[in-house]
Structures are given as structure tokens and as C-alpha cells.
Amino acid sequence: MAQKGIGVSNLPNVKYRSFCKAGIDFNIMTVGSNGLGKSSFINQMLGDSILSSDPFLKPEDGHHSNETVRALDEDIVDDPESKYFHRNSLINIQISKFFVMENDFQTRVTVTEVDGVGDGVCNEGCWDPIVELIQDNFRDYLDQERKNVRSLIKDKRIHICLYFLEPNPSHVSLVDIRTMKEISKICNLIPVVGKSDLLSDSEREECRNRIVEVLSMENIDVFRLDILEKEKISRTESPFFIIAKNVNSGDSSGHNREYPWGTMFPEKVESNDFYFLVDSLIAKNLIRLVETTEVFYDEYKTREIGLSIASKPGALGEDDRRLTKEIQKKIKEDERTIVELRQKLIEKRKYYESKMLEITSKYSNEKINSS
């Protein structure tokens, strides 16, 4: 009789079933000025018209509700907090929650839309509510961690922020630069250019170079997608250029984008990075986004615990307070060192990628000439 073992080899299947049953929380934030296609991006990503074309125009009250799609949890369907709308003089914020079920695997998706960034006459401090919202979610997670078993925690932390930039080949606004810089310190950030069909090929390249230059000069750290080797030649790093469709429920025409001069088919536009970006985020990098969010959360948690200890009267002696300040100073120095090293790695990576493109182009030309 052949030895069948004790069943250890079946543990991956048990883990898989457990993971499918528990599901995963995925929280995405879109940020930018009005009219750049943030809602259209989310609608096309989730495959249905779940968000209105402009959800910020007519909020009926403090809670602005949209119909949920694929909602399977009664708590979320009936809970008024599952739809939240906030408006102030600087920006508008809408939070919507959905359930997506695919092949018996459930994903709890929370979409946070931030609109109106840079649209005001005075935009000073418009990034503060965004930073506060991200940190409030960290604080909520920390409070739950103190009270509950970690597996029972509802994760509201933002896993990825897509920052929508205007399709302008010559300029990136100071408000966008400052907002991206503040967000990148506490959250995974990917800059994208909305409505990029307004740009010609040469303008698109100018826009890309300008944004890359700004990100480098301002030391804005962006999330680097894991890209397959065969895709690295044809795909570059962020910013990504997006053309989203007008998604309508029940529309069988392919959800194309209609213009006065005709119809455009986004899936046939070679320069449209939408499909590549969504596939990279969801299918290939979702778990890594959650893991890197843990790093941002641990940094926040360390600061909060340190401040809470230091603020208690009589909790620390003079030596302890001095030591705490030294540790905090060392952490800041280490963070600056990490940013500098990361920047050097980015520069080296760009250099080798340019060499790869040069060699590939040279090889292709030689092959053409020889034939």
C-alpha cells in the first residue's frame, strides 16, 4: 500500500478556502480636480454604472447615496454610513462601499472620491482634509486593533490613491504637486493623466517627461507596479494615461466614448493605459498594495504610541524624554536616507531601461537592414 502521508499537502487548499470565505478589503481613493474622469474610471473598473457621472453636483443631504452593485452583505446595504458625502469650501469627498463577488471570492471595495482639488480661488491647505481622512482611517484601525482580534477588524485604510492630473504637456500645478507630496508620505500613490485622448502623441510624451521631472525634483514617492519582463519594453512607469469609457447599465454597444465629431473606441487606442493599469492593480499587485499599506500604518502606529507615552504627565523622566526625541530624530533621518536611496535606485533603473530600449531599437534596425 502506497504511503499517502498525513494530509499536510492539503493545507494549501484549506488556506485557500479560508481566504475565499473571509474575503479581502480593498480601498481605493481617486483625487483630482473636477471633470477628469474619476467616476468614469471607477465605473469602468467595476464594470457597471454604479457612480453617477457627477456625484458632487446635487447632494441631497449629509449622506449622498448611490445604488450599490453586487451588494451581498445586509449590514452594508442597510447601513446609512455605507454612503457618505462631505463638502467644504476646499474639496468634496464621497465614500461608497460595494461588494464584488468573482468565482466565490468576495472583495469588499470602498471607493473614496475626492473632487475639486485646485478648483478654488484660494487652494491653500486643500490637501489637509485628504491627509486627515487617511490618518483617521489609520486611527480607526488602531482603535479596533486594541479592542478586537485582528481577523475581525474592518479595514478602512486607503490601499492606493490614484491622483488624476490634467492633460497639460507643459505644466503641473503647485496644488497638485503639494497634494501628491503630502499623500505620498502616508499612502501608496500613482499619478495618472485623465482624458488623455486630448493629447497628441508628441504632447503625451512631453506631458510624461514633465510629470516625471516634477516627481523627481520634489522627491514624490510613487508606487512601483510589478511589471513582467516582456511588458517592460512597451510599458513605462507612472504617470499612466487614461481614457475611460462612458459606462451605462444595459448598454450593449461596447460602452464607447461619444463625442460631437464621432465615436471613440478606448480599447483600440494603443496609448490608453487603462486596461494595463487595472489589470496590474487588481490581478497582480493587490496583495502587495495591502502589504505596503501595513508599512505606512506601522509608521503611523509608532508615532502615535510614542506621542501618547511622551504626553502622559510623569510617564517619562528627563532621560527618557531626551531618548524619545533622539529616536524620533533618528527615524526622520532614516526616512530621508531611504528616500535618497530610493531616488538613486530609480535613476539607475531609468538608466538601464533606456539602455535596454536603445539595444532593442538597435537590434530591430539591424534586423530590418539585414532583411
UniProtKB/Swiss-Prot annotation:
The keyword DNA repair does not apply. PROSITE patterns: G_SEPTIN (PS51719). GO terms for biological process: cell division. The lineage of its organism: Eukaryota, Fungi, Fungi incertae sedis, Microsporidia, Unikaryonidae. This is Cell division control protein 3. Component of the septin complex. Residues 32-39 are annotated as: G1 motif. Belongs to the TRAFAC class TrmE-Era-EngA-EngB-Septin-like GTPase superfamily. Septin GTPase family. Coiled coil: none annotated. One of its GO terms (cellular component) is septin cytoskeleton. One of its GO terms (molecular function) is GTP binding. Pfam families: Septin. Keywords: Cell cycle, Cell division, GTP-binding, Nucleotide-binding. InterPro entries: G_SEPTIN_dom (IPR030379), P-loop_NTPase (IPR027417), Septin (IPR016491). It comes from Encephalitozoon cuniculi (strain GB-M1). Septins are GTPases involved in cytokinesis. The septins localize to the site of cleavage and act as a structural scaffold that recruits different components involved in diverse processes at specific stages during the cell cycle. Septins are also involved in cell morphogenesis, chitin deposition, cell cycle regulation, cell compartmentalization and spore wall formation.
